[in-house]
Amino acid sequence: MIDNTWAGGVLFKALEHGIDISIQAGTKYLVGHSDIMIGTAVANTRTWDKLREHSYLMGQMVDADSAYTTARGIRTLGVRLKQHHESSLKVAKWLSEQPQVKAVYHPALPSCPGHENFKRDFTGASGLFSFELHKRLNDEELSAFMDNFELFTMAYSWGGFESLILCNQAEEIAKIRPGIERKLTGSLIRLHIGFEDTDELIADLQAGFDRIK
């Protein structure tokens, strides 16, 4: 089983790669507007009957409005994911050229670990990626950087039309993923690139960097 939310369920063909069950938070890219809570599961013929039986036994169901809204979102999924890919890659390329940035973790960039696997297995990228700063932001710098964006909003969820930002410190990541091979030293910034003008998003990030010089 795999969580296929980052790829919107379509940028990575899970069942074609031998995976039995592909799940995703439809709340994100399937719906596309961050206004419905729904999850989906797709299975191959070998596991579908058992999955469906468990779903019935647990009484899982979704209301009609959520089902309709999700179905409507799926109609524009391909167009939206294409825009997420193009916009996020443009921002990622710009970030990779900034002196404050140590590394950009966007799988479509050749410099990103796992890029070859991405090229082999995926048909595109979504809007979610992260970048690491050369330094660890102290509390004052973190507040100056994160609290004053014009377009980016601090929020955990993603997959909608809006651009979002979060920060995690290296020690926080180490606690969450103690077995990670690539050890972080600087602050890690997570971005979700939505449908705002990319030049304006870049200007917003540049203003953030200017605040921590």
Listing of model-derived features with the role each one plays in the protein:
Residues G32, A64-S66, D121-G124, E181-G186:
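Short, flexible turn/loop "capping" segments at secondary-structure junctions
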Residues L51, E141-F145, L201-L205:
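Hydrophobic side chains in well-ordered alpha-helices
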Residues L89-E150, M154-G159, I173-I180:
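Conserved small-domain helix->loop->beta segment predominantly found in fold-type I
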Residues K135-L137, S163-K213:
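PLP-dependent enzyme catalytic core of the Aspartate aminotransferase-like
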Residues T70-V79, S126-K135, R190-G194:
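Short, well-ordered beta-strand elements within core beta-sheets of diverse protein domains
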Residues G39-A41, F129, I165:
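Well-ordered beta-strand positions enriched in small/hydrophobic/aromatic, beta-favoring residues
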Residues M1-Q100, Y105:
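Conserved PLP-enzyme active-site core in the AAT-like
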